[in-house]
């Protein structure tokens, strides 16, 4: 809003803010930052409409892979989260430099009609349910009793007393 009041951005300019998937999905350890990122994404949509109509300024957010930044390092279990995202993402985690390159495209004329979007830059993590690599890791961490006990949660049907 300050940029708008001071008329600091040219027509067809672009504003990009960094977000994270925890704004939309629960991720252990992200806590209050998830709420802040959700608010940021909402502001980008709401204010994107206003600034877009007035000066064709585009406002977007980018949800980046977990990245060891100053803020990111404050997240409980960041290393584990990075390892999990790496195992889930078909293309692997995007680095901070990869993200910077991507954001540059959002400042270019190549994306003149992209606005009010949260764009994922996470190697495909946001679209995954479970990868084979993550499933293998998960299975190795289970005890046989855990698997056997929960394999037939409603009984096997073999025992008449079940």
Predicted regions and their residues:
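C-terminal helical subdomain
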Residues: 61, 79-114, 119-123, 143-162
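Short, small/polar-rich loop/turn modules that mediate ligand/substrate recognition or access, typified
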Residues: 12, 53-58, 114-116
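Intrinsically disordered, low-complexity Ser/Thr- and acidic-rich flexible linkers and loops
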Residues: 7-9, 138-144
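A short, polar/charged loop-to-alpha-helix boundary motif
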Residues: 129-139
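Catalytic loop of short-chain dehydrogenase/reductase
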Residues: 4-53, 64-68, 92, 125
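Short beta-loop-alpha junction of Rossmann-like oxidoreductase domains
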Residues: 65-77, 130
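Hydrophobic positions on the long internal alpha-helix
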Residues: 1-2, 43-44, 102, 106
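Generic structural signal for alpha-helix termini and adjacent loop/cap motifs
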Residues: 1, 5, 50, 108-112, ...
């Amino acid at each position: 809003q300050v940029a708008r009041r001071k008329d600091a951005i040219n027509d067809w300019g672009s504003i990009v803010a960094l977000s994270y998937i925890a704004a939309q999905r629960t991720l252990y350890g992200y806590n209050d930052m998830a709420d802040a990122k959700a608010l940021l994404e909402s502001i980008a949509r709401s204010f994107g409409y206003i600034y877009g109509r007035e000066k064709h300024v585009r406002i977007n957010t980018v949800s980046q892979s977990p990245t060891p930044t100053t803020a990111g390092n404050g997240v409980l279990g960041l290393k584990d989260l990075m390892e999990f995202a790496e195992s889930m993402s078909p293309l692997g985690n995007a680095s901070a430099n990869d993200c910077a390159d991507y954001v540059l495209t959002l400042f270019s004329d190549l994306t003149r009609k992209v606005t009010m979007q949260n764009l994922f830059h996470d190697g495909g993590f946001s679209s995954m349910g479970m990868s084979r690599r993550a499933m293998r890791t998960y299975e190795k961490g289970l005890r046989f009793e855990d698997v056997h006990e929960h394999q037939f949660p409603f009984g096997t049907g073999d025992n008449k007393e079940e």
